[in-house]
From Swiss-Prot:
Origin organism lineage: Bacteria, Pseudomonadati, Pseudomonadota, Gammaproteobacteria, Legionellales
Keyword Phosphoprotein belongs to the record: no
A GO term, aspect molecular function: DNA-binding transcription repressor activity
A biological process from GO: SOS response
Residue ranges: DNA binding: 19-38
Pfam family, one: Peptidase_S24
Bilayer-spanning residue ranges: none
Organism superkingdom: Bacteria
GO cellular component: protein-DNA complex
Keywords of this entry: DNA-binding, Transcription, Transcription regulation
Keyword Hydrolase listed: no
Protein's name according to its UniProt entry: Uncharacterized HTH-type transcriptional regulator CBU_1416
Length: 216
């Protein structure tokens, strides 16, 4: 019976790509692709191999060797990858040390990735909103895509770390003259939060996209 590593090598060879290119096209980190193709990781997470199977248009059982690879047709790949990027889903705490925390996410098999068609850099990441401060526009559980390379402008939604706080938060930035303020959105809060931006506060990125899943 074929193994995951041998099947992966066969599939990459059939479409003339290497591990680096497969990583670029699927969003799976190159070191992880390397460990899979060399047999160093024989028990990967489903979230790791699912994008690979989708890219090569095979099912999971075929990819890992439980079923034979299709032999009655030419090798196929999905053509949908070109318009999409995949970014790591990180914690609000890790957002405060991004991109220094990036190497951990690039080498971990536990990382979840989310797809986006937003025009973002390789340093972009995803966060899941917690709490009701930004409702009704961004309800609890909304996934946001954050671009750390973009400078914020008036009315942008930004991820920011306030002085002395261990985690980041999402707020809207309001500019009035030379002053800038951070605003929550929920009108049902006892006190709508509008805080003047202090010099010690740290911008961590601008929200590029928000995604809400209604079926969980």
């Amino acid at each position: 019976m074929a193994s995951l590593s041998s099947n992966l090598k066969t599939l990459m060879t059939s479409v003339h790509i290497n591990a680096s290119e497969l990583a670029r096209r699927t969003g799976i980190a190159q070191p992880i692709i390397h460990r899979l193709s060399t047999g160093q990781n024989t028990n990967p997470k489903l979230a790791t191999i699912k994008p690979i199977a989708r890219y090569f248009m095979v099912n999971i059982s075929q990819l890992i060797g439980e079923e034979p690879l299709p032999s009655d047709q030419s090798p196929q790949i999905t053509g949908n990858y070109r318009a999409w990027n995949r970014v790591p889903l990180i914690s609000w705490k890790d957002a405060t040390s991004w991109p220094e925390a990036l190497p951990h996410y690039q080498t971990s098999d536990e990382v979840m990735y989310i797809s986006t068609d937003a025009n973002v850099s390789k340093l972009a990441y995803g966060l899941i909103i917690q709490g009701c401060a930004m409702e009704p526009l961004f309800p609890n559980g909304t996934t946001i895509i954050v671009e750390p390379e973009r400078k914020p402008k008036d009315r942008d939604f930004v991820v920011v770390r306030l002085q002395g706080e261990p985690e980041a938060r999402l707020r809207q930035i309001i500019t009035e003259g030379n002053d800038r303020y951070l605003k929550s959105l929920n009108p049902e809060l006892e006190k709508l939060e509008v805080a003047r931006l202090a010099q010690e506060d740290q911008f961590l990125g601008v929200m590029a996209q928000a995604k809400v899943d209604f079926l969980r």
